[in-house]
């Protein structure tokens, strides 16, 4: 049986590729299990940046609803809880994460992409939340994340109407970091990943975690967190080396 999730190393960047192309990378329970296993792989845990991608036709067309035909509501709810846990694990990875998106990125596929820190989409990308039309709603973190990124009004438009949209509109909404030409999503993601891999790992992780915590923080708590994190990082060898290099360049 072919791998449903394939890992490859590109320098210090780990690429996680969904490999269920014949089903447009639909997220079956098996795929979700393979993705959870990939997140524990040492090739990923030892990397400096992780890129998630699919195929030319689809990043992922979303949950495999055909699996739900023989499931009762409790079993379907359990599936979405498990899927949500996988996506939270993606969001909680200490290193930066990038989604490289071509083709369909719908439902659970879009939820997976939104769990990443950055998203690069090419001109073939098609986004959408079709869940309400199926009698459900995005329930693996997508509703939360689209509100945080696009705001409640646009989130209601996207989720309630379920209309599809392309990379340019996704960029305007903030759902995509960069919109690129056809076939350039993965190369650009790898380029960004290589840049991130050169930066101090602890500073990247701390900045990522601080930013993630800000929406749930009061002004006072957010400022305190920021200053506390700065004080810790300022004592690291990375920070000391950077200050020394700056002094050498400026002749101080």
Regions found by a protein language model. Give the residues of each.
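C-terminal alpha-helix plus adjacent terminal tail
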Residues: 1-14, 162-168, 187, 191-252
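Glycine- (often His-adjacent) and acidic-residue-rich active-site loop
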Residues: 4, 33, 54-89, 105, ...
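Structural motif
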Residues: 13-17, 51-53, 72, 98-100, ...
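Terminal peptide-recognition signature
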Residues: 16, 20, 35, 52, ...
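A short, glycine- and basic residue-enriched loop/turn
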Residues: 21-24, 57, 62-68, 104, ...
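Crotonase-fold acyl-CoA enzyme core
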Residues: 88-202, 232
């Amino acid at each position: 049986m072919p791998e449903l999730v394939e890992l490859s190393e590109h320098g210090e960047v780990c690429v996680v590729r969904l490999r269920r192309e014949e089903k447009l990378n639909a997220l079956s329970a098996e795929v979700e299990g393979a993705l959870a296993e990939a997140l524990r792989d040492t090739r990923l845990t030892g990397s400096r940046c992780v890129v998630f991608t699919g195929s030319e036709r689809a990043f992922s067309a979303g949950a495999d609803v055909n699996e739900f035909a023989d499931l009762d509501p409790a079993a379907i709810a359990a599936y979405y809880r498990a899927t949500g846990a996988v996506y939270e694990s993606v969001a909680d990875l200490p290193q930066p994460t990038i989604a490289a998106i071509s083709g369909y990125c719908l439902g659970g596929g879009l939820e997976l992409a939104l769990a990443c820190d950055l998203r690069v989409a090419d001109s073939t990308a098609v986004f959408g939340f079709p869940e309400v039309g199926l009698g459900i709603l995005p329930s693996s973190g997508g509703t939360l994340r689209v509100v945080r990124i696009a705001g409640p009004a646009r989130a209601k438009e996207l989720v309630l109407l379920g209309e599809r949209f392309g990379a340019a509109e996704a960029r305007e909404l903030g759902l995509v970091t960069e919109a690129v030409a056809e076939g350039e999503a993965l190369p650009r993601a790898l380029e960004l990943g290589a840049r991130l891999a050169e930066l101090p790992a602890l500073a990247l992780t701390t900045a990522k975690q601080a930013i993630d915590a800000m929406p749930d923080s009061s002004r006072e708590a957010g400022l305190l967190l920021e200053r506390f994190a700065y004080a810790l990082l300022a004592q690291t060898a990375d920070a000391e080396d950077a200050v020394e290099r700056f002094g050498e360049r400026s002749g101080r």
